[in-house]
Amino acid sequence: MADTEGTSSSIPTSTNSSRHRASRGRGGRFRQAPRQVGANTADNLDAAPLMNPRGGHRGGSGNKRGRGQKEATSASRLQMQPEANFTFNPNAATFNPAQSVLFDPSVPPPTIGASTHSNQNSRQQEPSQNRRRRGGQQNTQRRQLEIQEQRGDSHPQNQSRQNNRNQLNVDRIANQQNKSVQNPSRNPGNSRRGQGARRREQKEEPLTEEETKILADKPLREGLVYLLENNKYECAICYTRITTRQGVWSCKTCYHIFHISTGCITDWARSSRDKEGANTWRCPTCQTENETMPYNYYCFCGRMRNPNFRVGEVPHSCGETCGGARKFGCPHPCTELCHPGPCIECKLFTTKSCNCGKTKKSVRCGSDQEVMCETVCGKQLSCGQHNCERICHSGDCGECTVILEQDCFCGKTPKEVSCNPCAHEKYSCGSECDGMFSCGIHHCTKKCHDKECGECETGANRIRTCPCGRNTLQSLGVTRKKCTDMVPTCDSVCDKWLTCGTPGKNHHCREKCHEGPCPPCNLNTSVICRCGTSKGVIPCDEYLQIMKTTGEYLCTKRCRKKKSCGMHKCQEVCCIQDEHFCLQMCNKRLSCGIHTCENVCHAGQCRPCLQASFDEQFCHCGHTVRMPPIPCGARLPVCSQPCVRPHSCDHSVSHKCHGEQNCPPCTQLTEKMCYGGHRVRKNIPCHIDSVSCGVVCKKPLKCGVHVCQRTCHGEECEKEGEKCTKKCETIRELCEHPCALPCHEDSPCEPSPCKASVRISCECGRIKKDAPCCEVDKMILSKLEKEEEEKSESDGEEKVVKEGILKRSTSFSQLNCMKCDDECKKLERNRKVAEALEVDTDEYGMNKLAPTISFPCYLKEMVRTNIDFVKSVEKILIDLVIQILSGEAYHDTFRAHLPAMSIEKRRFVHEYANFFNIASESVDSPPKRSIVLTAVRGKSHQPLVLISDLVNYKGALKTPGPAVIRKDIMDQALSKKEETEGLMKPLRCTEKMVVRREARPMKEITAPIPLKQQNQFALLGSDVDSDDEESNVPTTSNLVSSPPKDWWKDEEEGWQKVQQKEYVVEVERDMTEDEIEAAKKLDEGPTWEDQCDEDAPATETSSAIESPAKEEPVAELLE
């Protein structure tokens, strides 16, 4: 034992890495397979290296060293089983690779799984307590084997075995040293570090491209052998590789290989059998049914159970001749060694007859090639009368195609049938026979039959009773001798059962005994509809008619229940169904957008489209491929290569390969000419063919007179058949206005009244309006006629109006042909009075100096908080007044559109615009609500004091209540310079600058009412009040006096109720005596209060200027 321990090695000598992995298994048993090597053989012996559960070997009793030493110094740890057999060739210089240590399949699968590379992680995750327990059990087994070995050393047979063992260990050490020289990076030791390196070397690597090409060119059998020998075949269930030490099962149909040792195919078969509910299970790949459960591990040919792996042979094979049956009925068994996959074709030749058996030919045995000749088949067909006329063919000859004519029994309706054994027999056509009975008088009433018609139904021998059957002919004293003799009747009631009546209580025939069928029943029958909801009584004849047609009585009620699909209703009359199944086809478009749902109408969404293509799907450029199966409607695979489709431009392609039919438009910026050829536009995307420059087209139209006034466009200026509709621009001779008739091309203008708008006014210029030119001519003509008539009357000449007088008239050039009204007269009178009083007035007779201006608290608050906004609005209002008074505006109104602003700012604009007599209106919807200002000629003017000037008046903004400004006193106070500094300011600059005004005690003010500017000539009325009301020009009372109501009823702005402090109303009151005296002392001249009456002007001015406002509660206005 000492020599053995000194020279033995526990490292297997096989070059296959799987043997090393198997040798490191925990608790695994190994044995040598008996094999004949040569003529000189010794006893068979199994070499079983005892493995430590932690990866190291445990030595024998003579030498016990640590687990971390090298393999060369641990040869004594090899233990042998004396009862095992081993075949050894002493002449061999090295160890025979066929005698390698093999895996014993009798060991349970967990032992096998622990030695494979796929379960290394599970070994590391095993609890240390279980590893110690398992290691103790294995150590006990090793000790028992050592004792048995020591006891058997003195036996002669054991001594020879020991010598063989020594030689085996020497060969193993030599082989291991050769491996170490060839691969010095590999750790030959038995330490855990060496095992970790070997585990890293066993990492699964995918197939290379060269291996894939090799496997594609090889047959299935050779490809399976290559993958199994290199441990690269994967189980189709667990997706782990199958090693040479694992038990497998191979399908005989598809030749796929699955694990048995790890329980993959066994669990699959068990679940498949339970699911099918039969004694068979299906293959996972080809679905072939199998009866035998895959519990046992057999070789590929099925002869050897638990085959042992030998280096140089196909893994999982027995190494013997396959002997399997070949395809296509080849009688010769397979001569190859046990192998996976299908057997190769037989290489022998045999004589094979053609399908018709007339020609023989030598073909390869087991080939599926059919031998066919060029002669007619000639085999007898199934009819037994005709032969096959086809050329030599495979399979059955088929049915006879000869058409024969088959007669019926009565001979009325023959038919054509294909030749068959029964084609020569007659058949029954179903019509009445029309043959004669034996009496030769009556015709047969039977259907077409094969035998004779027989005896007459009314023969003397067949009828022996009366028609009702109650009395015999003998009792009635009548003897019939032939069929034509009358059948006697009795006097009793027929009483035969009729088909009408309720079930079980059918009616009886109430007629006397009679021949032939019973007459119709005159009674009624109670019926119940099929669904049981309707009952009724109908005549028996109607009941019989219903029974003949439908077979049951139906009511008219339609079922309204929904069917199983939940969409359609039953709609069946007299429905008796418990479950209403919808049998309509769904026919909805599936998710793929190509196919339709072929199921019956159902609830919910349709199933996804199950159609699939098994062809490879390529992208448009062919660079990217998607392997089958391809779901129906799947888009082309995403490709990262540039698009290779032809494009309309020469720019570089910036988009990738795509599946859409059209490429994205080219966005390269280019220069292109506009539609009309006016200019070249730059920075135009390439995909835009043409562009408009925005200039007027100005292409000549078909009329030859006008040009196109549309913006630069691409289509034709005029549609086909369209005429020019523009107005003729030829100048008229009389009024010098354009013709304005529809375009008449080069033809002269037709005489027509001129309808051009002309601005005319009265003599004083106050009244202005627009009128057609033809009407103006008539007015001027009538005026000239009157002037000529007056002139002729004064001179005593006849009235003569020469042609062309209108054009030479000075009145026509001024267009002041209208008459002045009473308002004009009143303004003229006021102007003259003002001139007499030396009062400064404007062109419309309005006083330029107003005595008092009162600004409400809200406007004062806006001035104090947002003076910039106040000045901007004030500038716009002043510009409007300047433009409307400058005479540049063609019309009497001028508008300005302010930008969008908040509701507080809009309220300020509405109130402040009233001081300018400018109308304001809110437009649009929040939050883009804005204001449109409208100034009117003759009404809108600038106030004497602007609200922005309040900052120049001391205390005007700080004093509570409205600010009332007295223009005449303020101007004098501001213009007077201070003589000395440090003295008290005059009283007029402090006390009389701002006056606190109280509201009227008898009137409740409910809404802010902006005030109008007072006019000291408002008391002057017109001579005729009715003329003033009918005037076209609005009077002072019609001026804009209150802002629109939208600023306090804006629901979208979300108003909050606030507490208004007070409302401002201008009220005229008399000054106290102290105030009058103080004013007289300060001023040299009289004040404005001395120029008018103290009572009437104030009252009438307020009533004339203030516009009535609707009294509404404050809360409602704010909401």
From Swiss-Prot:
Residues 1086-1097 have a biased composition (Acidic residues). Residues 7-17, 84-98, 157-167 have a biased composition (Low complexity). A zinc finger (NF-X1-type) spans 330-348, 383-402, 439-458, 500-523, 565-584, 592-611, 649-668, 703-726, 735-756. A zinc finger (RING-type) spans 235-287. GO terms for biological process: negative regulation of transcription by RNA polymerase II. Residues 867-937 form the R3H domain. It is found in: Nucleus. The keyword Repeat applies. Residues 18-29 have a biased composition (Basic residues). One of its GO terms (molecular function) is RNA polymerase II transcription regulatory region sequence-specific DNA binding. Residues 1-214, 1024-1047, 1078-1119 are annotated as: Disordered. Residues 113-128, 174-193, 1032-1041 have a biased composition (Polar residues). PROSITE patterns: R3H, ZF_RING_2. Residues 143-154, 198-214 have a biased composition (Basic and acidic residues). Belongs to the NFX1 family. May play a role in transcription regulation. This is Transcriptional repressor NF-X1 homolog. It comes from Caenorhabditis elegans. The gene is nfx-1.
